[in-house]
Amino acid sequence: MRWDIDSMMQITQQMPGEARFGVAVRPKPVQKESNIGFYLVMLAMLFEFGRPQDVVPPLKALPIPTLLDVSLFVAVLVSGKATFSNTQTKLWMALLTFMALWVPFARNNFWALMTLKEMTLYFFFYLGIVTFVNTTSRMQKIIFMWLGVHAFLGVNGILHHGQGVGGWLGDENDFGMEMNVAVPVAFFMYQAATTQRAKLLYIILLGLIVMSVVSTSSRGAFLGLLAIGSYCWFYSPRKIMSLIVGICLAGLVLIAAPQEYWDRISSITDDSTMESGTAGQRMFTWGIGWEMFLANPVFGIGQANFPWTIGEYLGGRTWQTKSLSGRQAHSLYFTLMPELGLVGIIIFGTMIYLNYRDTRVRQFFPIGQHRMGQKRENEERKDPELERAALFGNAILGGMIGYLTTSAFISTLYYPTFWILMGLAVALRNTTQSYAVAQSDIAVSSNPEQKVSLWGRPRSVRLRH
């Protein structure tokens, strides 16, 4: 079933001679929407995350991801549905403007410009999702597509000992972060499945994704996986079944993971790791990053300029006789703070809050379906489409939790993960809103004699695009 209002039945006005409460219902002819924009979104998803150009090198002869993103932007403008009124969209445009202003003043103008270009292309991708993923069926298809791509990534990662296909997914820590994002999506899709075959498929996919995280031997990915597991159980409507699934997955990891993996994980708290290992080096780098932020608290030093500026703040200090000039911050947060300052922190933090709000789609359900204290009655009245949307919201929010926790230890601010998840969150809110409003209109028109109490009256919902 589609969720866009235009595809629902239209209620005509009462005709002369009809009963007082008679209602004539006839379908309104709807011009079929072109699928070109949506197909471009699917292709962009494949090339951005699946990266076939890294598997088949001849594909690199053309900048296919760039061409797809630009084509998406053109398709959005041509569609006549382009709108920039959404709050996340406005914030993103403000961020791009801020980055553009930094280009001529940043220490390394080239990387500031290249990062601005990448973020602009992600913005085009985001607009394509918000514009063309406008029905329930399309939302479901894009999530299936996204999971299918990550299934391929998982198999490839396991076969290559935790290494990604290439590009921004080449490093095992970055690959572990991306697969952590996929864990809650597969988990809640399993809960949304209505057939045993589909449930089995998602359970297998979930096990595959978890084992791909294990294959990276990434300690940061392991900590992120623990946070995601807690999130999935907490937000699951079936706590006991989810606990059983979690125990089975833990058993799989215990059986399949080699001893070398556990030796590496156990080194997280070793004194050697904290004092002279990678953890100590990260904390030393973060300390320098904090000094950079304090010296440039409002506007920062410019996007992608941490490696080119850290040398100024070292003041002759070294890490075990080695200079860290040119080193990345190895943290989402210690990239954001010194590079974009309070301006970037406020924009990014507001985006996180709005994404959280948009994934809580039960706020758009008809009054009564999400009320507490009416469980038995609600079980009969639940709309499966809305319940599935709620699970999709949990999946997208869980993906963001996976990104935000695992990225505490790697520099992922300018990767597409967060920005595309934001597009999915906005699209989910819009489709759920449209469907809920349309269902409320149909419910009222189908029983015009029914008295609606003050507390049961459908709320007016203002659609935001």
Could you describe each region identified by the protein language model?
Residues 46-58, 335-340, 383-429:
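Membrane helix-loop boundary segments at the extracytoplasmic
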Residues 2-4, 12, 211-215, 235-276, ...:
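A membrane-periplasm/extracellular boundary helix in multi-pass inner-membrane enzymes
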Residues 59-66, 114-116, 168-180, 220, ...:
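Membrane-interface micro-motifs in multi-pass membrane enzymes
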Residues 2, 10, 69-73, 96-103, ...:
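Alpha-helical transmembrane segments of multi-pass inner-membrane proteins
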Residues 339-400, 430:
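Hydrophobic transmembrane alpha-helices and their immediate junctions
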Residues 1-101, 107-114, 131-144, 189-200, ...:
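Transmembrane signal-anchor hairpin modules in multi-pass inner-membrane enzymes, especially those
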Residues 55-58, 105-114, 161-169, 214-215, ...:
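Membrane-interface helix caps and helix-loop-helix hairpins in membrane proteins
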Residues 269-287, 295, 299-340, 359-373, ...:
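Long extracytoplasmic/lumenal interhelical loops at the membrane interface
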